[in-house]
Amino acid sequence: MSRRSATSSGHPKVCACPSGLDPYRLPNHVAVIMDGNGRWAKARGLPRMVGHRAGVEALKRTLRLCSDWGIGALTAYAFSTENWSRPGDEVNFLMTLFERVLQRELESLEREKVRIRFLGDLEGLPSGLQELISEATELTVRNNGIHFNVCTNYGGRRELVLAAQKLAQRAARGDLDPTLIDENSFEAELLTAGEVDPDLLIRTSGERRISNFLLWQLAYAEIHVTDVCWPDFDEVALTKALFDYQSRCRRFGGLDPIAANHLGS
């Protein structure tokens, strides 16, 4: 089954998705909280670091599936501002892992026309990783395939505070009338500026919280929680999430059309 979707260049793209899914009702933007790497490893008697490596493979798999099925954007919560409180050896491992994976996968991302962006306090990352992030961003900025956003050293509250500070600074300089600040001007100062909000949030490992992730952008997202730990998140798990999404009636604060008709009769 094929789906025609517009890439960022405006050209239609023919995509295939699993049988039974409505190709015209897939989310344009999927966000994922990749939880359960440590639990996955512990259940197998393995070090947590093995779980993180397996999590990378799950992310590559998910990106490929989303791209193949015509989903326009994938945003992954890779490392939060709170994750610095983890043991130092684990944090160092993760930073090294990010560097190695980005070095290894950049050519493939470019070949597949993926546009990658890293969202967060990037200046707080190791200098080598910062350089790779700049290289990857510049190399893929004109790509017209799936938008791949990697939230690294990211915190939702911090993002909102920074956006408010930028608007306040503009107002203090006289460049902005405070009475004209609205949702659009606020969104323009967010790290995700220019990206559509997520339609679907997927959280793995059964946890039911959003963990300071995309606090503004997830306002109207549908939320799917699966007990599957992130390293085991595969095509079957993603398909279930999409079926769940398509079973919802998205109301954006309004009434279900059936309920609205009933009230009006």
Curated annotation (Swiss-Prot):
GO biological process: polyprenol biosynthetic process
Disulfide-linked positions: none
Entry binding sites for substrate: 36-40, 48, 52, 80-82, 84, 86, 203, 209-211
Active site: D35, N83
Residues given in the record as Mg(2+) binding sites: D35, E222
Keyword Transmembrane: no
Cofactor(s) in the UniProt record: Mg(2+)
UniProt cross-references to PANTHER family, sorted A to Z: DEHYDRODOLICHYL DIPHOSPHATE SYNTHASE 2, DEHYDRODOLICHYL DIPHOSPHATE SYNTHASE FAMILY MEMBER
HAMAP family: ISPT
Family to which the UniProt record says this protein belongs: Belongs to the UPP synthase family.
Summary of subunit composition and partner proteins: Homodimer.
Protein name: Isoprenyl transferase
Phylogenetic classification of the source organism: Bacteria, Bacillati, Cyanobacteriota, Cyanophyceae, Synechococcales
Gene name, Swiss-Prot/TrEMBL: uppS
